[in-house]
Amino acid sequence: REDGMKYTNLAFPLTVPKDTGQVVGLEERGRPRMDGSGSYKGKAEGSNSSQGLWIASPAKTTLTEAKHIYWFESAYDAMAYYQLHQANDKDLRKAVFISTGGNPTVEQMRGVLTLSLPAKQHICFDTDLAGIEFAKNLQQEMYRVVRSTIEETPERKPYLDSVTDGKNLDEGDIDLLPDALRSSYGKYESAWEEAMSMRSSGLCHPDDIREQTDIMNGNYKEFREGLREFLGLDKANDASFVREQPTYPNKDWN
């Protein structure tokens, strides 16, 4: 710095999902301070923070080829996760790891999701209040991107209009669906109510509860397939996600 102070930081290149060959900034992380007060974290001056992310894959897998995408708030977290899990998951090297460098922006999320909807999205943000909010925002943006792939026809429009922005496609007004789909949803709903009743009663054997849960899940799968067919949604674009969290009491992965 101009005042003579020197710092040693790790720098992680930021790229835009549609052009990972062009570096648009740097995510910077410093060493932990000796007094335990934390460490420097930020982005290099001039970085494209609204669109740029750290995108990495040990096997050089591209976003469009990936079957698994792992989302983190920092590159440190992504590396820590890989070190913790790679010995027991040899395919992990084929995954793509993403760092948003903090609060994920709409442009960051949409840039990745539009190229990787068929992949399973692993949401690995921190477990503090900010991380919980980031996870919620990513889920909502995923639902928006899925919705954007559907052609709105006169037959589909009433139901699609009933789905609140940022919500799952199954959260619309079921009464606006064709008769067969309403019936299919009714089977799932009845199975769900039975499973919840069995769990809460304390009177049912775990094997019986598991059997009823399997029936419930099978009925939902049948309904979801029918919903996709009605909406003209390609199964590959019906994005899925899983929330992964570090072991308590750790709030992050490093």
Model-derived features: positions:
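Basic, glycine-enriched DNA-binding surface that flanks or lies within the catalytic cores of DNA
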Residues: 1-49
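Short active-site oxyanion
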Residues: 65-69, 121
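Helix N-cap/beta->alpha junction signal
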Residues: 73-74, 127
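Glycine-/acidic-rich phosphate or pyrophosphate-binding loops and their flanking alpha/beta elements
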Residues: 38-66
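TOPRIM fold recognition
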Residues: 85-254
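Conserved Rossmann-like nucleotide-cofactor binding loop
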Residues: 77
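Cytosolic beta-strand hydrophobic patch enriched in CBS
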Residues: 11-14, 70, 98
